[in-house]
From Swiss-Prot:
Name of protein: 3-phosphoshikimate 1-carboxyvinyltransferase
Organism annotation: Actinobacillus pleuropneumoniae serotype 3 (strain JL03)
Family affiliation: Belongs to the EPSP synthase family.
Family annotation (PROSITE patterns): EPSP_SYNTHASE_1, EPSP_SYNTHASE_2
Gene designation: aroA
Binding residues for phosphoenolpyruvate: K22, G96, R127, Q175, R347, R391, K416
Length: 432
């Protein structure tokens, strides 16, 4: 297996321009494909998850052209539901941001009835989709499980979404609600979506609503309990759509600056629609110096102290706090993060296991993790397993900010969101 060893870093300093956000890139491509008119999507992320969405759209008859560096995509919208030849199968890798929204969009009524199968890597078949399918069936959709009940692969008929009152469980993933919301305006009738349980990762719903508005559709949001969407609408191309830099990817560089130097990330700023920008507030609460601009966030080293916080609103960026916690004074507790367990891997168990390898004392709860800090000289050189999870690889690069090297297995798994991550991290790193 491939591996990379990072030697101890004495200081990090510099500026990094972030690649486009994964969540925004795949939403933008799907909305552009469903819309009337042509949309030029810029600062698109070039990564595995985006490639899976692009391949699926092509198979569904969507015409687009991609720039040579794959960061600009001009999409010709189909102006409504997709049409395809019966018997199509789409392979979506481990891309939740493609699997969930497409599951809903492909239920919409096509010109001629056809079936499509959505499948993916073995891990995708372990990632739940039941809450979304239950909701779609209430709206009149035809979705069948092909292997295990509640999980992909699924077979979908484009027999239409009638609308009406629909209940959806919000407690596992916000992607289910995002998928339903994005399909709802193209349903045959109005849809009233009621949330059951606590809605997790609310800021990701804000992203979805903001982007739907950019494509001409307004949703009535009644305090995140009920969402009302008029049916029989069309998405309208905004002609150009700029994808913000990935706020989750920013977290590694900002944390590095907070631990050992000064780093400025560009491509997101104080007006970003991504909830993960609030990661910078957590670093500030820990003692880092944070500066906000319209198009940048800067983090500068401060005396870090542990925090005890609910991080349900920033689930992806919260992982970075788990490794940064080793460099703080006092323990850190990250709470209300059960949905770490249904991501690319079970991130709670993975994080606890790998932190212990470098010498940390960690308590793993059902929906929390408690981490004791580690003196710089007491880190142990370990080989970090990454579980085919891009964020595990990136989080553990921070261990090199101690006095000990770190070896990361399968570093190329960062291709899911940030293929050049280790090159960029290296550019900011100084060694004595």
């Amino acid at each position: 297996m491939e591996k990379i060893t990072l030697a101890p870093i004495s200081r990090v300093e510099g500026e990094i321009n972030l690649p486009g956000s994964k969540s925004l890139s795949n939403r933008a491509l799907l909305l552009a494909a469903l819309a009337k008119g042509t949309t030029k999507v810029t600062n698109l992320l070039d990564s595995d998850d985006i490639r899976h969405m692009l391949n699926a759209l092509k198979a569904l008859g969507v015409n687009y052209s991609l720039s040579e560096d794959k960061t600009v995509c001009t999409v010709e919208g189909v102006g409504g539901a997709f049409n395809w030849k019966n018997g199509l199968a789409l392979f979506l890798g481990n891309a939740g941001t493609a699997m969930r929204p497409l599951t809903a969009a492909l239920c919409l009524k096509g010109a001629t009835e056809a079936e499509v199968v959505l499948t993916g890597e073995p891990r995708m078949k372990e990632r739940p989709i039941k809450h979304l399918v239950d909701a779609l069936r209430q709206a009149g959709a035809s979705v069948q499980y092909l292997e295990n009940e509640g999980y992909p692969p699924v077979a979908i008929r484009n027999s239409g979404l009638k609308g009406g009152k629909v209940q959806i469980d919000g407690s596992i993933s916000s992607q289910f609600l995002t998928a339903l919301l994005m399909a709802a305006p193209l349903a045959e009738g109005d849809m009233e979506i009621e949330i059951i349980g606590e809605l997790v990762s609310k800021p990701y719903i804000d992203i979805t609503l903001a982007m739907m508005k950019d494509f001409g559709v307004k949703v009535e949001n009644r305090n995140y309990q009920t969402f009302v969407v008029k049916g029989n609408q069309s998405y309208l191309s905004p002609e150009k759509y700029l994808v913000e830099g990935d706020a989750s990817s920013a977290s590694y560089f900002l944390a590095a600056g907070a631990i050992k130097g000064k780093v400025k990330v560009t491509g997101i700023g104080k007006n970003s629609i991504q909830g993960d920008r609030l990661f910078a507030n957590v670093l500030e609460a820990m003692g880092a110096k944070i500066t906000w601009g319209d198009d940048f966030i800067q983090a500068e080293q401060g005396k870090l102290k542990g925090v005890d916080m609910d991080m349900n609103h920033i689930p992806d960026a919260a992982m970075t706090i788990a490794t940064a916690a080793l460099f703080a004074e006092g323990e850190t507790v990250i709470r209300n993060i059960y949905n770490w367990r249904v991501k690319e891997t079970d991130r709670l168990t993975a994080m606890a296991t790998e932190l212990r390898k470098v010498g940390a004392t960690v308590e793993e709860g059902e929906d929390f993790i408690r981490i004791q800090p580690l003196p710089l000289t007491q880190f142990q050189h370990a080989e970090i397993a990454t579980y085919n999870d891009h964020r595990m690889a990136m989080c553990f690069s921070l261990i090199a900010l101690s006095d000990t090297p770190v070896t990361i297995l399968d570093p190329k798994c960062t291709a899911k969101t940030f293929p050049t991550y280790f090159t960029e991290f290296e550019k900011l790193s100084e060694r004595t």
